[in-house]
Amino acid sequence: TLDNIDYNRLNMSNVERIEIVKGAASSLYGSNAVGGVVNIISKVSAEPWTVNLNGRYGAYNEQRYGGTIGFNVGKFNSVTNVQHTQVDEKDLADGKTNEETEDWAFKKVYGDKTWNFKERLVYTANDHLKLTARAGYFFREREKSQTSKDRYRDFSGGVKGNYVLDKDKDLEIAYSFDQYDKSDYLPQDANDVRDYSNVQHSVHTFYNHTFVGKHILTVGGDYMRDYLMSYQFANN
């Protein structure tokens, strides 16, 4: 639905690289990947222990603080990332408030604050089996006015298993969950009213078979359950 892609959910401090895959790739990335895929690959801990702390301060009281803790010990590999940001509102209309201008939606950038938590744990049982689990939580509050604040939340998680049958064959099974909510917070009575919720459950599996060392046949399938409740729908 309109205006419901929240790029604030992306924590770029935890990104190792970005891949762009052109063309249809439904067998690898699900039925929605009909025109191409943008893969955002998160960092992997290569050292036994790693700690990274970062911060930034800019105009309009823009602040960003974050940290990453990772370890790679025995059969376990883990990366935990936390980030907090905040910024004051920016008036783009020479001092006029949004209510005083006709095209008010483009005259002010509201201030907001965010919290972002990510965890990924990988367990390599042996040369054939690898299990991956991930979880995340995102919260953003936008200072729309003194009587109302916009709140955005996201809960995500997933598990994945990779099994190598032999050097030419491997199998992957994965489940993922994502719930993105919007609500209006009314400070005067501490009331948080949810008016948007998008919940997705997805399961996919695929099998790869390599021929003559370079030709790969991939067979797979996926199932998705998508629930949407929105203020943009009548009587919803």
What residue spans do the PLM features occupy?
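Short acidic/polar hinge/loop motifs at secondary-structure boundaries
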Residues: 1-22
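Outer-membrane beta-barrel domain signature, especially the mid-to-C-terminal portions
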Residues: 5, 93, 104-109, 148, ...
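Hydrophobic, lipid-facing positions within transmembrane beta-strands of outer-membrane proteins
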Residues: 36, 49-51, 63-67, 115-119, ...
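Transmembrane beta-strand segments of Gram-negative outer membrane beta-barrel proteins
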Residues: 16-17, 42-57, 77-78, 171, ...
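Transmembrane beta-barrel outer-membrane domains
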Residues: 8, 31, 58-62, 108-114, ...
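Face-selective signature of the C-terminal outer-membrane beta-barrel domain
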Residues: 79, 122-139, 152-236
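Short, glycine-/polar-rich solvent-exposed loops and beta-turns at beta-strand/coil boundaries
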Residues: 1, 30-34, 94
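Periplasmic-side early beta-strands and strand-to-turn transitions of outer-membrane beta-barrels
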Residues: 27, 39, 47-48, 56, ...
